Structure formats: C-alpha cells, structure tokens
C-alpha cells in the first residue's frame, strides 16, 4: 500500500513531469471488465462555484492534523522507506520512470510496502521497461513478482496494460485520471498517485484503506462512507486543495504505525482526547 511523499518528489518528480508534450497519444484505451463493485468515479473537473453560507468542516480537524504531523515527523513508517516514490529508478529516462511508477502502484494493491519494494527491485535488476515486460513470458513475470497479493491477476493486468501503453501511448503512461483508470488493474487511488508521482500533478486525493479508515474514525466525512471512492469525494468537498498531496502520505504512515485496522494504539495517539472513536477501543 504505497503513498507519495508530501512535497512532490523534488528533482525526480520534476524529471518525471518534464516530458509531457509529445509523449501522450489522446486515443482512449479499451475498457476491461472487473469483478469488483463499481463506484462512480468523478474525474478532474472544473472547480465548483462557492455555495452561499458556511462550508461544512469537521470539528477539531486542524488540531487533529497538526498532531498527526507531529506523530509522523520521524518519517519512519514503511511507506517512508519503501513507498512507490522509492520504487522506481531515478536515473532512468522520464518515460521509463513513469512506467515504473505505474507498475509499482499496480503491484502495491493488497500488498505490504516491503513486498512491493522487493518485487520492484527484482524487476529493475532485469531492466524494467515496456519492451522488457512485453518480451517476458507470463511464468517468468509471475516468479519475479511473487508473493505480491493476487500475483496471478497482476501478471495478466501488467501484460495487458503494458501492451496498451506500447500501442496507444508510445510506451508512456496516460496523463489524465480518466485515461489511467481505463487501464486493466488500475483504480482511482492508483490513478491519482500516478498523477502525483509520475506527472507531478495533484488531480485528487488518493484514498487507500488507511485513508478511508482513519478519516471515518476521525469523522472527517459528513456521514460514514463505505468505499474509498466515496471517501475521496467527501474529503475533496471540504479539505483545502493545498493539503491533498500531503494527506495521503500522512495518513498512510499514521495507519501503518498508530491507527491500526485492528487494536489501534489509541493510548499512544496524541489525538486520543479529541478523536470521536477513541473510546470504542
């Protein structure tokens, strides 16, 4: 479960986003069916006009955010050391780096950062490019990426997506969320993180299981949400845009270390006195 670093990746991020013109082909990739429940996806849209009257925002959210920043100041969570922004080869050409970012995101689903990082290292040792993956047989690819979660499905999705990138985008990755989510094995969270890390563009909040869980526990959504995409829409309705990039990185690490899915460490949490759900645990 990877996340982006909060400040856009510095020099590497600028290199990644540098070669945008001329590297994309506007043709849309074909849709592939998925077994998971579909939730409507809102793409990058024009800013909504401000509605009259006070805007809803959660109680104590700014104080909670500052305390989470304090708890994350050491940057020693798995996401800080082995997140997606640490998985690609910073010395590779920008187009290759963007492809590696996308592959690391595809591998990260339902997989711990340590496992994703190790799989990416093994792939990079063989020269990870669009052409090298297309030339690799499925059995070999499976052996390399194992034991990432659902590795058999990911072999299929990686091969299908890589072929589309070669045919439709000249070996690069799409530059919009709408095009990215049409690729096999790429969901909204991956698309927004790809825009952030690969293109250095903030298109929306990347909501994974940690962000979804923590924002519901803190009541940062007006009403409880069941799916990450619902959570993203609810958060983007009130959270200032200049926090969209940082919030994923903050909450993923916080969820890995303190606000755990089971038996959260509430006694160690600086927000225990102002967390709406702390008393449940």
Swiss-Prot record:
Claim: DNA repair is one of the keywords in the record: yes
Cofactor annotation: [4Fe-4S] cluster
Domain (HhH): residue spans on this chain = 168-192
Q: Name one GO biological process term.
A: base-excision repair, AP site formation
- At what residues does the UniProt record annotate the site feature described as Important for catalytic activity? 208
Give the stretch annotated as transit peptide in the record, renumbered to this chain.
1-17
What's the record's note on cofactor binding?
Answer: Binds 1 [4Fe-4S] cluster. The cluster does not appear to play a role in catalysis, but is probably involved in the proper positioning of the enzyme along the DNA strand.
Q: Transmembrane stretches, by residue range? A: none
Q: Where in the cell is it found?
A: Nucleus; Mitochondrion
Q: What is its EC number?
A: 3.2.2.-, 4.2.99.18
Q: According to its UniProt record, where is this protein mainly located?
A: nucleus
Q: Which family does it belong to?
A: Belongs to the Nth/MutY family.
> Which protein are we looking at?
Endonuclease III-like protein 1
Lineage runs: Eukaryota, Metazoa, Chordata, Craniata, Vertebrata
